[in-house]
Amino acid sequence: MCVLYGTGHEYYSWTPSTSSGANLAGSVLSFGGVVFGSVIGWAPIAADYNVMLPEDTSAWKVFGLTFFGLFIPLVFVETLGALYGSALVNNAAWNAIYNDPEQGLGSVLGASLSSLNGFGKFLVFLLALSVVSNNVPNTYSAALSIQTLGKPFQRIPRFIWTIFVAVVYTVAGVAGKSHFSEILNNFLSILSYWTTPFVVVLALEHFVFRRRNGYNVNDYGDRSKLPLGLAAAAAGIIGVVGAVLGMNQTWYIGPIGKLTGTYGGDLGFEMALLLTSLVYLALRPLELNSFGR
């Protein structure tokens, strides 16, 4: 990655944005939604990788390692992506490669490293392997997530689910290879539409409703002692509805998403956060009073 920063530096553009006012705000909101989607996707699975830490591990240490373990690499890579996006404006050859359905972003990186000859090809090879290695945690966590759906799913060995997930995303990747950047951009945007309600419900449950009493770990295997999830389900559904109202995608623009500038701005995750919070804070006390759990 550091080499990529160097090989593309002569083409980086610092040209001020041509948009202003509400149009600029809409663009920033939409871009922010993509960035948020790339980060928030770790929220449902982060605990899979720190659950084995000693019980007396400082909460601040867990938070710090998790936060900075995500923040530093994500900012580093996304800044590089922004710089290469600006380089496409100044390098016609790279721009042509990027817009070629048969090549795309990976070929742009290859062209950037071509001046290094054999070493550049070696780095491209390492980049390809890094994509595979980065998918390993996602694949493992996907298998765990499937098993949380219920005992019928737990009866199937985890490695079977892991293979199944790998086959699914491999087929999807091959089928969408000609439109990879467009699909990835849309996926990251809509990813936050459901992960935001998920995170909000967990955060409110932890910091508000379990602030004093905490958790009894022995209850996790006993459904009669677990929350019914009525408040969570209602809040999640309303949150997704809010996301739909605020979304701004190529295939659909919600009524609230149209309000910012000429082309609108994506307010999907913000609307999901707001409505999920309001509904859960209103309904969870009623659920506790009615069912005691």
Q: Where would I find each of the regions flagged by the language model?
A:
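C-terminal structural cap/anchor segments
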Residues: V167-D219
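Inter-helical loop and helix-membrane interface segments of multi-pass membrane transporters/permeases
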Residues: Y5-S30, Y98-G104, Y220, M247-G265
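Helix-loop-helix connectors at the membrane interface of multi-pass transporters/channels
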Residues: V51-P54, V136-F164, F209-R210, G214
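Loop-to-transmembrane helix boundary motifs in multi-pass membrane proteins
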Residues: T148-S181, R223-A243
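Hydrophobic, membrane-embedded alpha-helices of multi-pass small-molecule transporters
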Residues: C2-G8, T18-S86, S114-T139, K225-A243
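TM-loop-TM module centered on a large, flexible mid-protein loop between adjacent transmembrane helices
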Residues: L80-N134, P152, G173-S181, N185-S189
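C-terminal membrane-solvent junction of multi-pass transporters and transport-like membrane proteins
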Residues: V199-A282
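Alpha-helical transmembrane segments in multi-pass membrane proteins
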Residues: L65, G69, P73, V77, ...
